[in-house]
A protein has these predicted regions:
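Generic alpha-helical structural context detector
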Residues: 73-77, 90, 111
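A short, polar/charged loop-to-alpha-helix boundary motif
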Residues: 65-84
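Active-site-proximal substrate-binding core of FAD-dependent oxidoreductases
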Residues: 1-10, 81, 86-96
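Mid-to-C-terminal Rossmann-like scaffold of FAD/NAD(P)H-dependent oxidoreductases
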Residues: 1-66, 101, 105-131, 137
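Residue-level detector of flexible, active-site-proximal loop/helix-junction positions
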Residues: 31-33, 92-95, 146, 163-165
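Positively charged, proline/Ser/Thr-rich regional signature most characteristic
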Residues: 130-175
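Short polybasic/polar patches that bind polyanions
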Residues: 18, 79, 149
């Protein structure tokens, strides 16, 4: 615990996988602790590491306020049984809006990982940005203006997430 926040980890994090020279991918999501329409839903961040070919789950880290303990236990159980991201996609908890959402955050992490493995999405990790040729690329920073003012990547255009629909014309269609 760090004040009111819970930080939890299970399995192998990316740093350890790199040290062991194990080929892996990771995904990070930021779901709510329970149904968003129910009051007092709190943010959490879930990062998982997995084999990019087989989907075997290597590790997971979760930071949040509510429900972190049960989500990290779900990840630990899948890792113990040498499970995959496909097993995560099947995770279900009893649904009650004050405590969970219709799709459990761990299942959502599995869905995002599947999208990465199948090529539906091609993530770019922050550590890779300096190696990417940025010519003919459009780098969009969707943070708030206050967050953007704390520092940004060279050439990034700031359009806060809440304003994207109103400012679609500012987005380059060919980059």
């Amino acid at each position: 615990k760090v004040f009111d926040m819970t930080v939890a980890s299970t399995g192998l994090p990316g740093k350890r996988l790199r040290q062991e020279e194990i080929d892996y991918m990771s995904s990070t999501i930021h779901p709510a602790s329970h149904a968003g329409y129910y009051p007092d839903a709190m943010p959490m961040s879930i990062k998982i590491t997995f084999n990019k070919k087989t989907g075997r789950l290597y590790g997971g880290q979760i930071v949040g306020y509510d429900g972190v303990d049960k989500r990290i236990d779900e990840l630990a159980l899948v890792i113990k049984h040498e499970g995959t991201i496909y097993d995560l996609m099947k995770v279900e908890q009893a649904y009650a809006p004050p405590f969970s959402s219709a799709k459990d955050p761990v299942a959502l992490a599995g869905y995002v990982a599947e999208d990465i493995i199948t090529g539906k999405t091609n993530p770019v990790y922050w550590r890779e940005l300096r190696d990417i040729e940025m010519e003919n690329k459009f780098l969009l920073d969707v943070r708030t203006p206050d967050e953007y003012s704390l520092g940004s990547l060279p050439g990034a255009v700031n359009i806060p997430l809440d304003e994207i629909r109103d400012r679609l014309a500012a987005l380059a269609k060919d980059e």
